[in-house]
Amino acid sequence: MTEYLGTFNGSKLKIAIIVARFNDLVTKRLLDGAFQTLAQNGVSKEDIDIYWVPGAFEIPRVAQKISQKGNVDGIITLGAVVRGETSHYESVCSGVTSGIAQIALEGKVPVMFGVLMTENMEQALNRAGGKAGNKGSECATGLLEMIDIEQTIDRE
């Protein structure tokens, strides 16, 4: 039996982070968590590109374009959809989830899903550095692990 476990070595990796401006009280905290975690794991700040988009619904389009270009090793998507502030909550959540999932499967590089979908702002803030940790940070470690696993598979 062979077991593969990804590492968190980010040196020499180029990372794209796509961040929704809508609900930026939350998304800026997610970005801070992702950025700090990438830096702590060896990713140079010069190798991190941040793309701001209007809202979560626009994230898949930009992720697709970045993935097709192939000039990054991985993509982190960050957004916050809060039910109480969005009258079309289900439609936005469904579209964003489907779009990012499709790019993750069909794109050239790993994509991490860091779009929060919560009932209220308190839940969102708890997941952006509050009681429930920082999902941006979790996406960063997950992305580094996925990049390493995929590179291992490609070498075999």
From Swiss-Prot:
Instruction: Give binding positions for (2S)-2-hydroxy-3-oxobutyl phosphate.
Output: E85, T86, R127
Keywords in alphabetical order, please. Riboflavin biosynthesis, Transferase
CDD domains assigned to the protein according to its UniProt record, in alphabetical order: Lumazine_synthase-I (cd09209)
Record carries keyword Hydrolase: no
Q: Name one GO molecular function term.
A: 6,7-dimethyl-8-ribityllumazine synthase activity
Active site as annotated: H88
**Coiled coil region boundaries:** none
Q: Which domain of life is it from?
A: Bacteria
Q: Which Pfam families match?
A: DMRL_synthase
Which E.C. number(s) belong to this protein?
A: 2.5.1.78
Which amino acid positions bind 5-amino-6-(D-ribitylamino)uracil, per UniProt?
F22, A56, F57, E58, A80, V81, V82, F113
> Do the record's keywords include Transferase?
yes
Supply the enzyme class, top level.
transferase
Q: Which reaction does it catalyse?
A: (2S)-2-hydroxy-3-oxobutyl phosphate + 5-amino-6-(D-ribitylamino)uracil = 6,7-dimethyl-8-(1-D-ribityl)lumazine + phosphate + 2 H2O + H(+)
Supply one GO CC term from the record: riboflavin synthase complex
Q: An example of a Gene Ontology BP annotation on this entry?
A: riboflavin biosynthetic process
What pathway does the UniProt record associate with this protein? Cofactor biosynthesis; riboflavin biosynthesis; riboflavin from 2-hydroxy-3-oxobutyl phosphate and 5-amino-6-(D-ribitylamino)uracil: step 1/2
| SUPFAM superfamilies from the UniProt entry | Lumazine synthase
The role this protein plays is: Catalyzes the formation of 6,7-dimethyl-8-ribityllumazine by condensation of 5-amino-6-(D-ribitylamino)uracil with 3,4-dihydroxy-2-butanone 4-phosphate. This is the penultimate step in the biosynthesis of riboflavin.
Q: State the family it belongs to.
A: Belongs to the DMRL synthase family.
Concerning NCBIfam families, the annotation shows: lumazine-synth
Protein name as catalogued: 6,7-dimethyl-8-ribityllumazine synthase
Annotated organism of origin: Pediococcus pentosaceus (strain ATCC 25745 / CCUG 21536 / LMG 10740 / 183-1w)
